[in-house]
Amino acid sequence: MKILIVSKCPTHPTDAGNRWWILSQAEMLISMGHEVHFLYINELPLKRNAAPYIESLEQTRKYWGDKFHLFTVSKFQKYKMIAAKLYRMKFGHNYWKVDDQYPFGLEQMVNELDGTIHFDVCIINY
């Protein structure tokens, strides 16, 4: 089977539990003979030093090679998501709609990848 794993969390360096889980999941699926691709949702921080994020991105890209796909959240989109978060906190009693933090354009990219590669399974990780 062709499998797409989608995550905002890079797989490398494997120095946190969620990264370890995603990589272990991928390696298990690969060991079973499946073709596994990784779509990384890149959301750079606005105020923090971006160097560690860029380093993680490069290490993840290197590991996955041609099975690596990148979706980058624009700064405008990031500000929009922050505004929605602040609005929900102030006026919505922290009630969130399911798509409040869903990056615009991600669905289109997944559909384009699926149209080209024809995935059988799509796994979404945190």
Can you say where each PLM-predicted feature lies in the sequence?
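N-terminal subdomain of nucleotide-sugar transferases
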Residues: 1-68, 115-116
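Residues that line or immediately flank small-molecule/substrate-binding pockets and catalytic motifs
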Residues: 7, 43, 72-75, 126
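Extended hydrophobic/Leu-rich segments
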Residues: 64, 68-70, 76-79
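Conserved nucleotide-sugar donor-binding subdomain of glycosyltransferases
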Residues: 74-126
